[in-house]
Every structure is written in structure tokens, then in C-alpha cells.
Amino acid sequence: MDLKRFIRDIPDFPQKGIVFRDITPLLRNQEAFKEAIDRMCELVFDKEFDLVVAPEARGFILGAAMAYKLGKGFVPVRKPGKLPYKTVYEEYQLEYGTEQLHIHEDAIEKGQKVLIVDDVLATGGTAEALIRLVKKLGGEVVSLAFLVELSYLEPRKRLEGYDVKTLIVY
């Protein structure tokens, strides 16, 4: 199945000059969504890890589904003020601004192996912040899996030395 045909391009969103890759048509189609999750799981079948870590909002959708299918725990990473317990955070640059990512301070035990999952790999800034959060808590990132990669932004330069997997490349 060509999953790319389920990704909608939204020009000038969230600001002028940005082409937003909207995955909601893929999520709405049960066959495409199932295919995407199955194929993302296949990308990491040979990796040994304990937890799937994913950021809100669309990362939750993919990450939680993958964690369920792979029989792993799921750790949500959220924006400021959204998690109820004590957190640690990292600040990072987006394609269109600055943001913070927070994780519960006890979400990852020292030495646990982690798969990071998100919907889009754009500049690599979010992924870098997620890696720093995992390391801050004593975890080890074994791989990163993304539904979409915007290769023209060269995000892999920021993730050198990490195993990066993507399904759909622009």
C-alpha cells in the first residue's frame, strides 16, 4: 500500500513558508493506519528495548499503538503543565519556534532501553530533545522510528550515531 497518498499537504501551516504533512487522512483510514503501525513495528523488530517514548500529540497515537503491538510499556512526553507528577524537561527549536518537552522524573529507570516514536522527522530538534530527556533519566536510546521524514531539511545530520527509521520520505 502506498501510504504517501494518505498524507495531505497543507501549505503555509502553521506559518507562511511551511508545508505541513497532515497524517489525519491516514489515521482515519483503518487499512492505512493498520499498515503504517505494522510497517513501523517491522522497522524495529530486531531491536531490543523496554519502552516506547513518544511526544504529544500525534506521536502518542503512533507510539502507543506500537507499544501495544510490540508488548512494551509506553511513556508519554508532554508540553509544560500537562503531566501531573514531578518532571524534567528539555527546551528545543522547532521548524517554527521554541518549545519544551516534559517527562515524569520516574518514567525511565536507569539502564532501560528506549525506542523513540514520532509522526514527523523535520529538523531533528524534537528528536534531539527526546534523546536528551531519555539520557537525563539514565535510559539508552536504541532506535528512533518516524512515519514521515522531511529529508530536504536534513534532520539526520542532527541524529548522527543513532539508528533512525522512517516509512515515508519527502
From Swiss-Prot:
One term of GO molecular function: adenine binding
Source species taxonomy: Bacteria, Thermotogati, Thermotogota, Thermotogae, Thermotogales
GO terms for cellular component: cytoplasm
InterPro entries tied to this protein: Ade_phspho_trans, PRibTrfase_dom, PRTase-like, UPRTase/APRTase
Keyword presence, Glycosyltransferase: yes
Role of this protein: Catalyzes a salvage reaction resulting in the formation of AMP, that is energically less costly than de novo synthesis.
Subcellular location: Cytoplasm
Pathway(s) per entry: Purine metabolism; AMP biosynthesis via salvage pathway; AMP from adenine: step 1/1
EC numbers, comma separated: 2.4.2.7
Protein's name according to its UniProt entry: Adenine phosphoribosyltransferase
Cited CDD domains: PRTases_typeI
Entry keyword set: Cytoplasm, Glycosyltransferase, Purine salvage, Transferase
Domain of life of the organism encoding this protein: Bacteria
GO biological process: adenine salvage; AMP salvage; purine ribonucleoside salvage
Keyword Cytoplasm set for record: yes
Biological source species: Thermotoga sp. (strain RQ2)
Assembly and oligomerization: Homodimer.
Family per similarity comment: Belongs to the purine/pyrimidine phosphoribosyltransferase family.
Pfam families: Pribosyltran
Catalytic activity: AMP + diphosphate = 5-phospho-alpha-D-ribose 1-diphosphate + adenine
Principal location listed in the UniProt entry: cytoplasm
